[in-house]
Amino acid sequence: MGKLFGTDGVRGIANRDLTPELAYQLGRIGAYVLNKDNNKRAKVAIGKDTRISGDLLESAMTAGFLSMGVDVISLGVLPTPAVAYLTRHLKADFGVVISASHNPAEYNGIKFFNREGYKLPDEVEEQIEAYILNNRDVDIRMEGKDVGTVTVDEKSIEEYTDFLKTTLDRDFKGLKIAVDAGNGAAYRSAPKLLKELGAEVILINDTPDGMNINKGCGSTNPEVIGALVKEVGADIGISFDGDADRLIAVDENGEVVDGDHIMAICGICLKKQGKLKNDVIVGTVMSNIGLEIAMKEYGCNVVKTKVGDRYVLEEMVQGGYCLGGEQSGHVIFLDYNTTGDGLLTAIQLIATMKAENKKLSELAKVMTSYPQVLVNAKVKNENKEVYQNDAIIMQSITAIENKLAGEGRVLIRPSGTEPLVRVMLEGKNQEELNVLATDLAKLIEQRLN
């Protein structure tokens, strides 16, 4: 992970950290690095979420691409996974998403996809970064007919939702589905898809104003969709983050069904159908112990990676697996798309409900979660990795592990995108975990600041 590119592209406060000048350079240098071995005129597909700064950054980045002779297809406001799909579908040479996912509205981000719709490997990001950090430009300025042009894809949402429908063998008639669009990228595509599948849709937080993305809504605020489900008597509630690459669901009682539960439910269904490749689900070190226990009962294994959907995806591609994801709701169905896809995950989960003819609360019983506590310690970016060298912090971690006595675990993880060290404890006693995690986070803040 470099200085510009984090675990999920370049991210920062728009117009301060992520400036139009930087976006322009990312367009120019990105075009050069990604297209230098290609002898034909390239094209790039660009999509964005609903942030106010999306237009600013898209305009600047587009100018960079055009100056390099790259044609731009502007997809408009669209989920991140839709851009991954449309990059392939439209035969673009690469794709770009302008979004900061679950971060507050003042943040934004830029990430690239290759022509297959996969995030770029670290070494390619490092090449782009090296040019920009060393203030090196490339000696290419297209002129006349060689300057790039922009076309707007007016049917981008339709192309994406039509594709999603091809992944199903049933409709959703008779279901009432509550949707929290998080004032983000799925605010049009989610209701369109679900209505076309025959469901009754109750929709909230579908009026983005550029500043209300993720604000008191969406997948990081599941209590909002939970309350709506109970109020309207829905069969299921689904809640998206800002760029709709993740999903949190709630059952008919308003109880949260997180990414681990979704993978268990869909994984067991795929196993029964003989479609779970190698009988493996790919999770992360943050995946609940309960997921492993549930999958073992059905003769399946959970392979764990570092946190981050890019690492889950790498493992899936290398191992030939079809289902993987994170507790946070990033779930990848690799038979259909190359990235976490909130809408795809939602319809696969709902299709499983229909196939099994069971309520979501019933399906969710396949997995029992151990209590997990996550506390963030605020630590300067440059100090995030130093905790391993601090003897007092390491002694405290060992003491907690001894206390949990093999029936729990401690996981310390520096954030890839924010100045935080995440402290996660898992075990049987929620109250004990709360105290231990809070004390450890405080110690980390004291020692590392």
From Swiss-Prot:
Binds 1 Mg(2+) ion per subunit. GO terms for cellular component: cytosol. PROSITE patterns: PGM_PMM. GO terms for molecular function: magnesium ion binding; phosphoglucosamine mutase activity; phosphomannomutase activity. Its cofactor is Mg(2+). Keywords: Isomerase, Magnesium, Metal-binding, Phosphoprotein. InterPro entries: A-D-PHexomutase_a/b/a-I, A-D-PHexomutase_a/b/a-I/II/III, A-D-PHexomutase_a/b/a-II, A-D-PHexomutase_a/b/a-III, A-D-PHexomutase_C, A-D-PHexomutase_C_sf, A-D-PHexomutase_CS, Alpha-D-phosphohexomutase_SF. Mg(2+) binds at S101, D241, D243, D245. The modification Phosphoserine is found at S101. It catalyses: alpha-D-glucosamine 1-phosphate = D-glucosamine 6-phosphate. Its EC number is 5.4.2.10. The active site is at S101. CDD domains: GlmM. One of its GO terms (biological process) is UDP-N-acetylglucosamine biosynthetic process. Activated by phosphorylation. It is an enzyme of class 5 (isomerase). Belongs to the phosphohexose mutase family. NCBIfam families: glmM, PRK10887.1. Catalyzes the conversion of glucosamine-6-phosphate to glucosamine-1-phosphate. This is Phosphoglucosamine mutase. It comes from Alkaliphilus oremlandii (strain OhILAs).
